[in-house]
Amino acid sequence: MAEGAASREAPAPLDVAGGEDDPRAGADAASGDAPPPALGGRMRDRRSGVALPGAAGVPADSEAGLLEAARATPRRSSIIKDPSNQKCGGRKKTVSFSSMPSEKKISSAHDCISFMQAGCELKKVRPNSRIYNRFFTLDTDLQALRWEPSKKDLEKAKLDISAIKEIRLGKNTETFRNNGLADQICEDCAFSILHGENYESLDLVANSADVANIWVSGLRYLVSRSKQPLDFIEGNQNTPRFMWLKTVFEAADVDGNGIMLEDTSVELIKQLNPTLKESKIRLKFKEIQKSKEKLTTRVTEEEFCEAFCELCTRPEVYFLLVQISKNKEYLDANDLMLFLEAEQGVTHITEDMCLDIIRRYELSEDGRQKGFLAIDGFTQYLLSPECDIFDPEQKKVAQDMTQPLSHYYINASHNTYLIEDQFRGPADINGYVRALKMGCRSIELDVSDGPDNEPILCNRNNMAMHLSFRSVLEVINKFAFVASEYPLILCLGNHCSLPQQKVMAQQMKKVFGEKLYTEAPLSSESYLPSPEKLKNMIIVKGKKLPSESDLLEGEVTDEDEEAEMSRRMSGDYNGEQKHIWLCRELSDLVSICKSVQHRDFELSMKTQNYWEMCSFSETEASRIANEYPEDFVNYNKKFLSRVYPSAMRIDSSNLNPQDFWNCGCQIVAMNFQTPGPMMDLHTGWFLQNGGCGYVLRPSIMRDEVSYFSANTKGIVPGVSPLVLHIKIISGQNFPKPKGACAKGDVIDPYVCVEIHGIPADCCEQRTKTVQQNSDNPIFDETFEFQVNLPELTMVRFVILDDDYIGDEFIGQYTIPFECLQPGYRHVPLRSFVGDIMEHVTLFVHIAITNRSGGGKPQKRSLSVRMGKKVREYTMLRNIGLKTIDDIFKIAVHPLREAIDMRENMQNAIVSVKELCGLPPIASLKQCLLTLSSRLITSDSTPSVSLVMKDCFPYLEPLGAIPDVQKRMLAAYDLMIQESRVLIEMADTVQEKIVQCQKAGMEFHEELHNLGAKEGLKGRKLNKAIESFAWNITVLKGQGDLLKNAKNEAVENIKQIQLACLSCGLSKGPGGGSEAKGKRSLEAIEEKESSEENGKL
């Protein structure tokens, strides 16, 4: 290799237009917009196959000739590529059987090598921000990488494979991180080749993520097998996958002729991969046979294997498998364990657990016996429920259910009795069945006088279709606790006369019996009972007569939502509240959900009882949320509030529930009969916590003293922002939009990722469109979202057709942020009406990282950021009351210490990741693997030794080491040191913060009086109260963040130590380090069972 081949090429001036050395800079040069070339530079129609000799006198392309040829040909275990099909040039015009897209998929290392030998254009990035177009090829002898044009002679414009130390995917070198054009370069199209003793980098950008993956996979394969004979690439036919397919074919070939009917072959492939369409399999066989200039209804073994591999190999999964298997074409138990720990975030995984996964998902008997997982089994595993994006812990009740009812969001239905629009839609009892089965915990009963003294439920715009009140009660009683055992709230809309009200009360008592919760609320309490205490109880929400009155009936205000809106629209509304008569029997069924009218927050906080609740129309709630967001949140800490859709929504469309959840409103009633984006949000939100219909609100909305505004457009005090990294990799089996008018099944899909939450978090990103591909469109695009309040955030994936006529919707999936699982996950897509679509998925990678401070996610390297940015600290506010301000001033220094310790540890970890060439989303396990690969010499002995100092794992060199390794060790030592400082100091600093918080809280009750004594009133007093709540929120939040950071640091140290042991960095002179490391691990842990120690 020429000295400095990758870093000393003289660039052409930037203003040169064209020519051999034309540097192309900017987004157009590197963003990946250009379509990828056909793989390996092959012709679009090229296919490979077995050349069979024909029998005498029988045409070889006839079925008889094919059968004779197969009998005359010895059974082959290899697929021989037909050289005639490799020729470039024109073909006769003929009918095309090519499937879309027609480029051959990558399904093996051989395909990658062939592509690299054919060559393609890559963009070469220099540290001086210049970008050059170069044509890169791999030598036919597989020994060197070459590029042209170049001002150097041919022998210098090359890179020997033997000099390559490492291949990195993504923008993970200093050239990319600090390059002024880095933001315009697609992350998934970039890769770097590190070579030479000093780890110089050759930084490249492909025109698509697919092409980048081919080069990375191919180069890694070559580097890992550089000592093997040159003909090792030709052994594809001997891979476990081909041997398994051969066995499958032979088992189905009952005649032993090496040929099967096409119908049998199609059925066999469908058995192996049920997601494939029959038409697609038949088209693939025709395509393969057409490339051999024969059409027949019989399939050879080779054609069967080729068809299966091309149809069932997902390139993105193949590239992943090669990456994590250390360039093999299968995973063993150790590979799988590393994948689960480092990528999927699985803890406490063992080799036996990995072998069990292999036994359950590997398709070949040989693989199950030998303990390896090939591409097809790995694909099935990734598609299994074990790799679902939804956290399995949230599929059961996982939250504290002992808090007051007002501390939960409650799954609520509006106009439950309707299954169509509210203008003319008939009443249907199935509305209640569906809602209750979906976990709804608040349903509406709009009751009117019926014939024969029997109350009824009906749409008052369509009285002909009605339900008897009793039949509805019986259905509710039957399904009330099928989906959830937690309390069900019946929102009673009473439009009945006094006689029929008595019938209502009698029927409810008779049907529900002891399930009815009628206990009088205790005046000694301040909050509602908990869902846990109210299990299997039915609570009636409605009007109530004064308890001190002995009257058997009386007047109460009417809360007929639809009637009031009609009066407003007709101009009959004069501001006066309508009244109705209420009987004592029905009144006595109302206990802890007494309906009252809302006037203003100040009056409510003084006079409203905790068992009283208000209902707000959508219009009124929106006005309050905009004008008094903080007051609305504070009100909802103690009292239940219900928001219902505007009566103007005659089509039963839905409001956006997120707008009111942001204000803390617990019961946001939805029209379950109307699907769409708003109902998707509602359904997705209540999937968490076991789908029980109750979701605990964020602590900042529950704490008695806290500051939170529903309209915040910045960071939330006391909450550390997180960064969500989502890579949209591919889609599987996308259907045509149901309402589309276009002919054919061709679609042009793209993906939108929506973030829903507080205003500061709401945003949307979309991928590029993939043309004419519904089966396995590859997107390979990564997005970053800063999330300021994770507990109130949802992620919605939407797949749309860019070339639609009539309808663009393909599918969607909505999931709470807290339920996301990290790693490679399949998203099960739902239809427009919310049903799971079989075999229709989106393949993604999820990672969540910490983000210090506010603003957009940073894209520059840590060294650049540290040099340009002064650290920002969360500030406490001045209240204007000296006694209290003096207490909060004591907390300023501990707060700075807490923030410094957390950020210093995070920065040290990021620095190690950068030096290892890994992105911020990488795990520490991945860092240690990369680190060990550089610190272990060619004879498998480490150049460093693991040394435990006071229970912390340090690495000490065993002799002279290169500067590159010195820098990595220095970064590693700093990470350990900063973690140690945090672990040892966190408790002391947190205690100081907690003491300041407690001292401040002692003034909470007297804050109004103290303010009045100091002359604060009106706006100034409100500002002082707001600042007080801000400071308490900051102190509590920072204390919690510090505690969590310490726990994270302790866990990191354990993982680092285990990784050092498993990577072989403990093998120092004289041995013994490994045992010492294991003993030290026990000292770090606070509590650990003997069983867990045994596993370690």
Curated annotation (Swiss-Prot):
Subcellular location, principal: cytoplasm
Subunit structure: Interacts with PPP2CA, Ins(1,4,5)P3, Ins(1,4,5,6)P4 GABARAP, GABA receptor beta subunits, GABA receptor gamma-2 subunits and PPP1C. May form a ternary complex with GABA receptor beta subunit and GABARAP. The formation of a ternary complex with GABA receptor beta subunit and GABARAP could be the key step for facilitating the association of GABARAP with the GABA receptor gamma-2 subunit and to allow it to be transported at the right destination.
Interaction with PPP1C: region residues: 83-222
GO cellular component, one term: cytoplasm
Record's subcellular location: Cytoplasm
Organism in which the protein naturally occurs: Mus musculus
Biased segments, Basic and acidic residues type: 1075-1096
InterPro entries: C2_dom (IPR000008), C2_domain_sf (IPR035892), EF-hand-dom_pair (IPR011992), PH-like_dom_sf (IPR011993), PH_domain (IPR001849), PI-PLC_fam (IPR001192), PLC-like_Pdiesterase_TIM-brl (IPR017946), PLC_EF-hand-like (IPR015359)
PROSITE patterns membership: C2, PH_DOMAIN, PIPLC_X_DOMAIN, PIPLC_Y_DOMAIN
Sequence ranges of Acidic residues compositional bias: 550-563
Protein name: Inactive phospholipase C-like protein 1
